[in-house]
Each structure stands twice: as structure tokens, then as C-alpha cells.
């Protein structure tokens, strides 16, 4: 590719999926430019690495580009996309560019409705500890690396495979993981769940004859597609027929302790005693996927154990901000932030919080993400939001969608009041959320901020507020 394409421009370069690919291309020696309406940590990092980052979209930004990369979040009438097409500059979907990177190495693609980012991070961390020095492209910041992408010298590239727009069907990896299959992004599949499952079956057909599909058989929908997967399979989970199986899982001080039984290629491997530096049974499953891949690639057991014990987590995936003082100075509350925005993953995260912090009041500040998701999962949202002890609920983060009156934040608030499990506090503007949290907390509470939108900035504001308070008292 490099002898033809030297200058690559990204429309929406600050996005989680785009910035990682841009960073790897920078490290490969390409000249990278990009535009974004916002200025975030990803754009600042890319600029520091040598990318030309422009704020706002303008037709002039694509001047000199040999290719323009876009995500599905970028509309077809974007001025940069229109300019590229008029100048016959190739407009390349993000997944197609990721597929090009995968052609340079052996691809490990992590798919599934929930858990992709954490599982990708765990796989990358275990392979790195095993000396395989993988390249990785992750949808969140891997805390140990300080970035969501890295160019390694090894044979493997580990990346998330996105089913939301069916773009994962562009990838041709040698190892695939499917963590679970759930009803999300159903507009892509004509609101037909059978079509979504068929897409995952087609994803496994992208594997070569020597490839491996690593499947979580705890998930009933993954189990349903199992008979239709024609490539070699490694089953993982808590289920008795899992080849990579966790037993005796228990929560200890915010970590998960468990034993892994392994049956691969007709051989019984020695059991592994694992301490995972993450809470929750769902993260045990995510770790099992990493263990399955590492075992297949003959990573030493000691490296697997060490990587999972010392895993530093991923930004906005049960990210702990520590203790924050209550406004009255009578004590502190524990602050945790999470990207969860679908009822299934929210339930898993809240269960993990209960396990990590037993017998403590759980306060959730939640920003729904997309009106269509809120509409499609409305009753499930009401159910999961009703499990917390106190709830602050904001308006839906639109993500470019038009409002749906019966599926907005106020509609959710009314439904929760009718259900009677929790009395929600509706917070109209996200700027008001930090103060609303401070008004609601008591000493000893666990506060979880959750959502895929602008609520991600709230924990930093709470920490800054505390630091300013401490400075004024010094």
C-alpha cells in the first residue's frame, strides 16, 4: 500500500476506533492528517506524535490526501467526504483500513455485542507478557500502555471487530473471539435478530482453514450458532463442556479469583490458578478468551498468570477514580466510571460493583446513548436501572439521531417512577451532573458514572472539584 498511498486523512480522527488505526499508521511511517469537531485526549496524542489535526470539517482539509478514512458516524454529506469524492480520492471505511493493517500481520479479531474492548485489552496484555509483542488497536485506552494502539514487532495484530455496522465482515483474521450476541444496533440488520446471528456465522467463515474460532458457550446465542461454524472451535466459559473452563470463581477485594481447567487438542493442560485484577463474572469470561488464545499460541503459563494479576484495566471500563470527599466533609465516596450503555452490560457492571463493594449503597449516574437503543431496550433499561439504590438520569446522548419523544430521558424517568423500585433524579444538562452527584452522595457510597456519551467527562470534573477544594483549604 505504501508505494501508492503515503498521505492518509481521517474524518473524525478523535473517535475511539479511528484514532488507534491512525496511530499505527503514523508509526508505520505514513503521513497522517485528520479532522474532528472536538479536541480530546486522542487528538492531542496524535498531534504530539506528528499527525496534523484540524478542528472542524472543511473541504480544504483533504488536500494532498491519497486516501480518506471514514467511520459510519461520518455522514455522506460531510464536506470532506464530498470533496474527496469530487477529486477521486478513495474514501475508505474504517474497517477496510483495519483489514489492510491485518493483512500485514496475523489478525486476532475480538467480536461480540459486549466485552470487546476489555477482551481485546486482556489478549494484548497476555500476548505482550508472553513476549509476542503484538500490535493492537483497541476501542479504549489500555492503561498500562497509555494508549489505545501500539505497533509491535511481533507477528500478531489484536483488534476489535465491530458488528454494529456489519463492518467486521471486512476482516480476515486467523483467530476470532465471539464473546456474546445480543440485540443491539438492530437497525443495521433490519430489526431481524436472525440476520444478526447469521452475520456472526459469516464472520467465522472469514477464517482460513487453519484459523480458530474462540467462542463463549455460556452465551445462549453463541451456543446456537455453534453447529453452523465450520472452522476449528475452542469453547470457553463456565459451562461444563467448555474446553477453557473457569471453576470456583469468587470476588476478593475487587479482584476475581478462579481456577481454569483446560482441554485442548486432546490434551489436558495443567490447571491455572488465576487472580484477575478486574471485578465481575463477565470479566472472568473475558479473561478466559485471552487464556484460550494464549494457550493456543503456547504462551507460558507463568506469563498468563502474571499478565492477568497485573492487568491495569482500560479507560472507562470499570475505571476506578478512588475516594472523593463528600461535600459536608464527613467522609468519602468511591468513584467508578464505566462505558456501559446496553442493559445487559450495565447489569454485569452493576453486579460487579455489588461484588467489589458489598453492603454499600450504590449510586448510579447514567446517560442513555442513542434514542433508538433507548426505544428498543426501554423495558430492560427500566429493569436494570431499578436495581440501584439511588439514580441520577440525564437526557439521552443523541449520537446524531433525531429525538424520539417516548424514548427520551424524561420518559425513562416517568417509567422508573411508575415501577417504584428507585426514585430517579432527572438531570437535564450534563453540566449539572457533577453537582447533582455531590448533592446525592453519602459517606461510604459507591458512585458509578455510566454511559457512552459526554458523561465520560464527569469523573474528571469531580476529581478536579476535590483538588480545587483541597487547594483552597491548604
Swiss-Prot record:
This entry carries the following GO cellular component terms, namely:
cytoplasm
Top enzyme class, one word, equals ligase
Tagged with keyword Repeat? no
The pathway where this protein functions is: Cell wall biogenesis; peptidoglycan biosynthesis
- Annotated binding of ATP, by residue: 112-118
Q: Which reaction does it catalyse?
A: UDP-N-acetyl-alpha-D-muramate + L-alanine + ATP = UDP-N-acetyl-alpha-D-muramoyl-L-alanine + ADP + phosphate + H(+)
Q: Which domain of life is it from?
A: Bacteria
Q: Which Pfam families does this UniProt record tie to the protein?
A: Mur_ligase, Mur_ligase_C, Mur_ligase_M
E.C. number(s) listed in UniProt: 6.3.2.8
UniProt-annotated location(s): Cytoplasm
Spell out the InterPro entries in the cross-references. Answer: Mur-like_cat_sf, Mur_ligase_C, Mur_ligase_C_dom_sf, Mur_ligase_cen, Mur_ligase_N, MurCDEF_pg_biosynth, UDP-N-AcMur_Ala_ligase_MurC
Q: Name one GO molecular function term.
A: ATP binding
Q: Report the protein's function.
A: Cell wall formation.
The family annotation for this protein states: Belongs to the MurCDEF family.
- Identify this protein by name: UDP-N-acetylmuramate--L-alanine ligase
Amino acid at each position: 500500500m505504501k508505494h501508492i498511498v503515503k498521505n492518509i486523512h481521517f474524518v473524525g480522527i478523535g473517535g475511539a476506533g479511528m484514532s488507534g488505526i491512525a496511530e499505527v499508521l503514523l508509526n508505520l511511517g505514513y503521513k497522517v492528517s485528520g479532522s474532528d469537531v472536538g479536541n480530546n485526549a486522542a487528538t492531542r496524542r496524535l498531534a504530539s506524535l506528528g499527525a496534523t489535526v484540524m478542528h472542524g470539517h472543511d473541504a480544504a482539509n483533504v488536500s494532498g490526501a491519497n486516501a480518506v478514512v471514514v467511520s459510519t458516524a461520518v455522514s455522506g454529506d460531510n464536506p470532506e467526504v464530498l470533496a474527496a469524492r469530487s477529486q477521486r480520492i478513495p474514501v475508505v471505511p474504517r474497517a477496510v483500513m483495519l483489514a489492510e493493517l491485518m493483512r500485514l500481520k496475523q489478525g486476532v479479531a475480538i467480536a461480540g455485542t459486549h466485552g470487546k474492548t476489555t477482551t481485546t485489552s486482556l489478549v494484548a496484555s497476555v500476548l505482550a507478557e508472553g513476549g509476542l509483542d503484538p500490535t493492537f488497536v483497541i476501542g479504549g485506552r489500555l492503561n498500562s500502555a497509555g494508549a489505545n494502539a501500539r505497533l509491535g514487532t511481533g507477528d500478531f495484530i489484536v483488534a476489535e471487530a465491530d458488528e454494529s455496522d456489519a463492518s467486521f465482515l471486512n476482516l480476515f483474521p486467523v483467530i476470532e473471539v465471539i464473546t456474546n450476541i445480543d440485540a443491539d444496533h438492530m437497525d443495521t440488520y433490519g430489526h431481524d435478530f436472525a440476520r444478526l446471528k447469521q452475520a456472526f456465522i459469516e464472520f467465522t467463515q472469514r477464517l482460513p482453514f487453519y484459523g480458530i474460532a474462540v467462542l463463549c458457550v455460556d452465551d445462549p446465542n453463541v451456543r446456537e450458532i455453534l453447529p453452523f461454524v465450520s472452522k476449528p472451535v475452542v469453547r470457553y466459559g463456565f459451562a461444563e463442556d467448555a474446553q477453557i473452563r473457569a471453576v470456583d470463581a469468587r470476588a476478593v477485594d475487587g479482584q476475581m479469583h478462579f481456577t481454569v481447567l483446560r482441554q485442548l487438542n486432546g490434551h489436558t493442560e495443567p490447571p491455572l490458578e488465576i487472580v484477575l485484577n478486574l471485578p465481575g463474572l463477565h470479566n472472568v469470561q473475558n479473561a478466559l478468551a485471552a487464556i484460550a488464545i494464549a494457550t493456543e499460541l503456547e504462551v507460558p503459563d507463568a506469563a498468563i498468570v502474571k499478565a492477568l494479576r497485573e492487568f491495569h484495566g482500560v479507560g472507562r471500563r470499570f475505571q476506578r477514580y478512588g475516594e472523593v470527599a463528600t461535600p459536608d466533609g464527613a467522609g468519602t465516596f468511591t468513584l467508578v466510571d464505566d462505558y456501559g450503555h446496553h442493559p445487559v452490560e450495565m447489569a454485569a457492571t452493576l453486579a460487579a460493583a455489588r461484588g467489589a463493594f458489598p453492603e454499600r449503597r450504590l449510586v448510579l449516574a447514567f446517560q442513555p446513548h442513542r434514542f433508538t437503543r433507548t426505544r428498543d431496550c426501554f423495558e430492560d433499561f427500566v429493569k436494570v436501572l431499578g436495581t440501584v439504590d439511588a439514580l441520577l438520569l440525564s437526557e439521552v446522548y443523541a449520537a446524531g439521531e433525531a429525538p424520539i419523544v417516548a424514548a427520551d430521558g424524561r420518559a425513562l424517568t416517568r417509567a422508573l417512577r411508575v415501577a417504584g423500585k428507585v426514585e430517579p433524579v432527572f438531570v437535564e444538562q450534563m453540566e449539572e451532573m457533577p453537582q447533582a452527584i455531590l448533592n446525592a452522595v453519602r459517606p461510604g457510597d459507591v458512585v458509578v458514572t455510566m454511559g457512552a456519551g459526554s458523561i465520560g467527562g464527569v469523573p474528571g470534573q469531580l476529581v478536579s472539584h476535590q483538588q480545587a477544594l483541597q487547594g483552597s483549604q491548604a
